[in-house]
Amino acid sequence: MLKPIGNRVIIEKKEQEQTTKSGIVLTDSAKEKSNEGVIVAVGTGRLLNDGTRVTPEVKEGDRVVFQQYAGTEVKRDNETYLVLNEEDILAVIE
């Protein structure tokens, strides 16, 4: 498993639907890039100049929405994860 460093989080992306409501199958080029996912790991938090650490606002298991082109995709054990900074998370889905 990947362990994020600092203020980074690891997200398992939620894939977009492969077919439309009317039953049309979408090709990879027609699908929009997903910007939702579930947090699978959280770093220790951002380190400030005075040496204190800011506790992350998100936790493992949170469903989140993040900026469209944020982060770096990493493939591990046949799974694709997204490593991004906590600041790139826009909202937690309740």
Swiss-Prot record:
Cellular localisation: Cytoplasm
Any single biological process term in GO: chaperone cofactor-dependent protein refolding
Function: Together with the chaperonin GroEL, plays an essential role in assisting protein folding. The GroEL-GroES system forms a nano-cage that allows encapsulation of the non-native substrate proteins and provides a physical environment optimized to promote and accelerate protein folding. GroES binds to the apical surface of the GroEL ring, thereby capping the opening of the GroEL channel.
Family, as annotated: Belongs to the GroES chaperonin family.
SMART domains reported for this sequence: Cpn10
GO molecular function: ATP binding; metal ion binding; protein folding chaperone; protein-folding chaperone binding; unfolded protein binding
Assembly behavior: Heptamer of 7 subunits arranged in a ring. Interacts with the chaperonin GroEL.
NCBIfam families reported in the protein's UniProt record: PRK00364.2-2, PRK00364.2-3, PRK00364.2-4, PRK00364.2-5
Assigned GO CC terms: cytoplasm
Induction profile: By heat shock.
Record's keyword terms, sorted: Chaperone, Cytoplasm, Stress response
Alphabetical list of InterPro entries matching this protein: Chaperonin_GroES (IPR020818), Chaperonin_GroES_sf (IPR037124), Chaprnonin_Cpn10_CS (IPR018369), GroES-like_sf (IPR011032)
Pfam families in alphabetical order: Cpn10
Protein name: Co-chaperonin GroES
Domain of life: Bacteria
